Amino acid sequence: MPTIQQLVRKGRHDKSAKVATAALKGSPQRRGVCTRVYTTTPKKPNSALRKVARVRLTSGIEVSAYIPGEGHNLQEHSMVLVRGGRVKDLPGVRYKIVRGALDTQGVKDRKQARSRYGAKRG
């Protein structure tokens, strides 16, 4: 515990809150290039093959981003738009790819929640 004299000299400083989406550098989304597209398994108790892409962002940082929806057209060197939002059962995946933007196609035959998956009407 500091003495009053030490507090007079230095004072106390607040800890700044850690940002959940640091790689976006304050932007709502960032563009990036896929360096690897792969599937991975979620942690217990879930079981699946989740689609994930390793993306090098324009900020220079490389992150893992989840590819939402059923089916995708992404491969290495695809240009993607990345937004924040973690996937609870995939450790280390704190970003999602925006469907229907840049090289990412929207989800085919999607009827509900279309805007989230870049699906056109009809």
Curated annotation (Swiss-Prot):
Family annotation (Pfam families): Ribosom_S12_S23
Domain of life: Bacteria
Signal sequence segment: none
A molecular function GO annotation: tRNA binding
GO CC annotation: small ribosomal subunit
Keywords (A to Z) from UniProt: Methylation, Ribonucleoprotein, Ribosomal protein, RNA-binding, rRNA-binding, tRNA-binding
Gene3D superfamilies in alphabetical order: Nucleic acid-binding proteins
SUPFAM superfamilies given in the database record: Nucleic acid-binding proteins
Protein's UniProt keywords contain Cell cycle: no
GO BP term, example: translation
InterPro entries named in the record: NA-bd_OB-fold (IPR012340), Ribosomal_uS12 (IPR006032), Ribosomal_uS12_bac (IPR005679)
UniProt xrefs under HAMAP family: Ribosomal_uS12_B
NCBIfam families given in the database record: rpsL_bact
UniProt record similarity statement: Belongs to the universal ribosomal protein uS12 family.
Purpose: With S4 and S5 plays an important role in translational accuracy. Interacts with and stabilizes bases of the 16S rRNA that are involved in tRNA selection in the A site and with the mRNA backbone. Located at the interface of the 30S and 50S subunits, it traverses the body of the 30S subunit contacting proteins on the other side and probably holding the rRNA structure together. The combined cluster of proteins S8, S12 and S17 appears to hold together the shoulder and platform of the 30S subunit.
Subunit description: Part of the 30S ribosomal subunit. Contacts proteins S8 and S17. May interact with IF1 in the 30S initiation complex.
Protein name per UniProt: Small ribosomal subunit protein uS12
Gene designation: rpsL
